Amino acid sequence: MDTASHSLVLLQQLNMQREFGFLCDCTVAIGDVYFKAHRAVLAAFSNYFKMIFIHQTSECIKIQPTDIQPDIFSYLLHIMYTGKGPKQIVDHSRLEEGIRFLHADYLSHIATEMNQVFSPETVQSSNLYGIQISTTQKTVVKQGLEVKEAPSSNSGNRAAVQGDHPQLQLSLAIGLDDGTADQQRACPATQALEEHQKPPVSIKQERCDPESVISQSHPSPSSEVTGPTFTENSVKIHLCHYCGERFDSRSNLRQHLHTHVSGSLPFGVPASILESNDLGEVHPLNENSEALECRRLSSFIVKENEQQPDHTNRGTTEPLQISQVSLISKDTEPVELNCNFSFSRKRKMSCTICGHKFPRKSQLLEHMYTHKGKSYRYNRCQRFGNALAQRFQPYCDSWSDVSLKSSRLSQEHLDLPCALESELTQENVDTILVE
């Protein structure tokens, strides 16, 4: 076998591999047309590809159609693999621009000679030897599909396969030496018509930039998980410590507390709470100390009721309800009205006699009086909590002792709420608002 025939066999085998994308290690993407090729062949004829392959490891080379048109690149690619130009004519100026872009000086004289041999009457076909994606459906076709078709000589079978699969149009070179002029007129014309009618759609590249493709098609699960987690953590519930109502923002809670201060809601709120930094935050309380306070309060009420005689003449004044009293303080706030006090149903105080639970100490205090059938004498001070309850002890003891000795002294103790009020006024309690 001589060298010429050996080289011809090698070129034919390489060209056949290129036709079917077999053993091709490079893809050239020009617009929506993809050409399979071998790096060694491209680098041998084009300095442009040679420099790209030196500095870039990607298997897909993207070229803008404004730099070189797909039909011009297919024309030059056919010359690279066969040493002969296809039987078609292309615009000479566009051909020269494509050769200059690829820096393929060796192909310049061959392409010019081949282009001048054919007369202008020769059919101008696209002669694309690449995979072109043109479809009316919004389907994504992966570039790595292997298209199994008949050999290049059987053009009729190719047209049938292309008709059966309109979503994947494989435009193969028709202008080979073994093809006739009729075959050139049939297939390329129909292909060009379908190309104009069907809009191109982008495809996912399978072999080139696998990491970027995966990141685009499959978003990271961390971004999907952190989205709802961030929104859940960003929502903070603010709790009103006096009525238990919840708010999603600090400003809404502050407006709600203003309604407590103004007296439009039953529970009074110290005005200084509105300036607190930890407004609406819940702090845990010691349950043991809470239970101790409840026991002390219950024992105090039982002891006071055992020592106190019945005073039926004191029932002329109707006791005030809890909802009718609100307190505004400026210096020392009562224990119950501290902004760290958490109004929670889990910490209800139970009655030691009947077991009934109450959310507030004042309600439990009033309830303990109902067991003895007496009115709540300290209704004007029920918002003060255990701190002021301890102050009542000397008054209650002295009142019960004197009432047993003399009815005259018991009559003087009828003004005990007034005395308590004057004492509280001296201790920086500004006003007691009665609705």
Swiss-Prot record:
Its annotated compartments are: Nucleus
Q: Which InterPro entries match?
A: BTB/POZ_dom (IPR000210), SKP1/BTB/POZ_sf (IPR011333), Znf_C2H2_sf (IPR036236), Znf_C2H2_type (IPR013087)
What the entry lists under PROSITE patterns is as follows: BTB (PS50097), ZINC_FINGER_C2H2_1 (PS00028), ZINC_FINGER_C2H2_2 (PS50157)
An example of a GO molecular function for this protein is: zinc ion binding
Where does cross-link Glycyl lysine isopeptide (Lys-Gly) (interchain with G-Cter in SUMO2) occur? K142, K148, K198, K204, K303, K330, K405
Q: Which SMART domains does the record match to this protein? A: BTB (SM00225), ZnF_C2H2 (SM00355)
UniProt entry keywords in alphabetical sequence: DNA-binding, Isopeptide bond, Metal-binding, Nucleus, Repeat, Transcription, Transcription regulation, Ubl conjugation, Zinc, Zinc-finger
User: TM segments?
Assistant: none
Residue ranges occupied by any BTB domain in the UniProt entry: 1-107
| Tissue distribution of the protein | Expressed mainly in hematopoietic cells and testis.
Zinc-finger (C2H2-type) residue ranges come to 238-260, 349-371
Q: Please provide the Gene Ontology terms (biological process) for this protein.
A: negative regulation of transcription by RNA polymerase II; regulation of cytokine production; regulation of immune system process
Query: What Gene Ontology terms describe where this protein resides (cellular component)?
Result: nucleoplasm
Q: What is its main location?
A: nucleus
Its biological function? May be involved in transcriptional regulation.
This chain belongs to the protein called Zinc finger and BTB domain-containing protein 25
Q: Which organism is it from?
A: Homo sapiens
